Amino acid sequence: MLELDLQVASETSAPDEARLRLWCEMGLRQRSADSELTIRLVDETEGRELNNTWRHKNYATNVLSFPADVPDDMLDIPLLGDLVICVPVVNREAVEQGKSVDAHWAHMVIHGCLHLLGYDHIDDEEAEEMEALERTLLEELGYPDPYADDESADPPHSDTPSKDHE
């Protein structure tokens, strides 16, 4: 079961909680344990501040993933982590990339959830594994391959803030 804490700190239109939950559940379905995660929807000011604080990059990115860094035996709850999604950035990227807003949101949420599960795209092999899983999950939801238009494209800008990830 997924315990989702949705925090809306953006005035920009975003998908509703039911769709966010569906996409999270799809991204986390390989995890058999219960999961608790927070999604915080932000505008560009907060997105830029968080990206600058945690990644030392002074721009708002689409998704930031913050995995819980607490030993399992220290918690009474199955805390997975937090996703911070910059609503205007995701909406703008969808238009710029010629994708449906819904499909791009699904991709970004699934991408962020996979980061919380430990997937990454630091090297090519990891990126290929993560992208293949994203393609499969999105296809099951009826969305097109997010990488189809440009096979040489970099993965989404979503990152997991950590000193090891730069």
From Swiss-Prot:
Binding-site list for Zn(2+): H111, H115, H121
Cofactor binding, per record: Binds 1 zinc ion.
Entries under Pfam families matching the protein: YbeY
Principal place of residence: cytoplasm
GO BP term (any one): rRNA processing
Residue span of region Disordered: 140-166
Organism superkingdom: Bacteria
One Gene Ontology cellular component: cytoplasm
InterPro entries linked to this entry: MetalPrtase_cat_dom_sf_prd, YbeY, YbeY_CS
Names of required cofactors: Zn(2+)
Record's keyword terms, sorted: Cytoplasm, Endonuclease, Hydrolase, Metal-binding, Nuclease, Ribosome biogenesis, rRNA processing, Zinc
Statement: the UniProt record of this protein carries the keyword Chloroplast: no
Cited PROSITE patterns: UPF0054
GO MF terms, alphabetically ordered: metalloendopeptidase activity; RNA endonuclease activity; zinc ion binding
Listed Basic and acidic residues bias regions: 154-166
Subcellular location: Cytoplasm
EC number(s) stated in the UniProt entry for this protein: 3.1.-.-
Family the entry assigns: Belongs to the endoribonuclease YbeY family.
Purpose of the protein: Single strand-specific metallo-endoribonuclease involved in late-stage 70S ribosome quality control and in maturation of the 3' terminus of the 16S rRNA.
Listed name of the protein: Endoribonuclease YbeY
Organism: Pseudomonas syringae pv. syringae (strain B728a)
Gene that this polypeptide is encoded by: ybeY
